[in-house]
Amino acid sequence: LRRQRQMCIRDSLKVQRRGIYGTMERDVAMMQRMLRFVPPALKGLVDLERVISEFWSAAKEEMDFLREAANMETFSKNNENVVFVASPKLYSELTTAQVLVMEYIDGYSVSDTHTLEQEGYDLVEIGEKLADNYVRQIMQDGFFHADPHPGNLRIRGGKIVWLDMGMMGRLTPRDKSLIAK
């Protein structure tokens, strides 16, 4: 990869483990077969078939790196004018359904409050900007990061950097209107 790009700084590769799709498919099929053995009382509490189906849908989306690359492009475009938000640069010409190539992001985890304070960051300001951006993603863009845990958020150069766009949520205008009420 480095020979293909002269301007290489530091890149990050996300590589799909060989055979993972088939393994997951078999695991989901086994979970569906095991539903026969769940006591009727438990079946009434939770729609386990639906839970397994939702899990499989989400897993398939996360295993498609071309979809994640498209999510990265959409997220980047939606936030291009938000001065305190960034995301990794995508190298789409090198990305495939099984390999995602992007800029490596260092920086501080949002949960590393001690270091952030030592480096002069205002934790309240970070929290306010994070909340502001997340509400904007939901209410304005209708396209939001669906896995916003500390491992997917970094602080670098005064910006909040969002990582891992494998799971993104989408809202229709009607959905946004209902939430606003």
What role is predicted for each listed range?
Residues 147-149:
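Conserved catalytic-loop position in the HRD/HxD motif
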